[in-house]
Amino acid sequence: MLLPDWKIRKEILIEPFSEESLQPAGYDLRVGREAFVKGKLIDVEKEGKVVIPPREYALILTLERIKLPDDVMGDMKIRSSLAREGVIGSFAWVDPGWDGNLTLMLYNASNEPVELRYGERFVQIAFIRLEGPARNPYRGNYQGSTRLAFSKRKKL
């Protein structure tokens, strides 16, 4: 069952919370302080924006910390305005028990650069209640992330 706006406000810890980001059946995550593009770490808060060049990907940290109960998971989709500009998002489930900021991957499939401003809404997360709490909620490598989390599979 998808959680409606009033249950999201009541049951999901989102910091910092923005009323503008709360949607009828989800929450719009915003561009956070760090990004990684073409091998470079970008201080988005300082620069005010991140630019994804044509045919390139970016890792972007969410502004929000999300903490999920053991019986709720998250499913994310790119906002349609960005999809209409040729931006594709590849996102994993947000497992029950997750706590931290999220590192998300966007790919600019267009022939034009795409600019995202610090604090701009870019991905919507919907929260889905499980039939019961997970026996083994997430406690993995990325738990508690507050900075960009790179793949544990290889060194950059």
UniProtKB/Swiss-Prot annotation:
Pfam families: DCD
GO molecular function: dCTP deaminase activity; nucleotide binding
Pathway participation: Pyrimidine metabolism; dUMP biosynthesis; dUMP from dCTP (dUTP route): step 1/2
GO BP terms in the entry: dUMP biosynthetic process; dUTP biosynthetic process
Record Gene3D superfamilies: 2.70.40.10
Annotated EC: 3.5.4.13
Binding annotation for dCTP: 79-84, 95, 124, 138
Reaction catalyzed: dCTP + H2O + H(+) = dUTP + NH4(+)
HAMAP family: dCTP_deaminase
Enzyme class: hydrolase
Subunit comment: Homotrimer.
Assigned keywords, A-Z: Hydrolase, Nucleotide metabolism, Nucleotide-binding
Protein function: Catalyzes the deamination of dCTP to dUTP.
Protein name: dCTP deaminase
Family: Belongs to the dCTP deaminase family.
Domain of life the protein comes from: Archaea
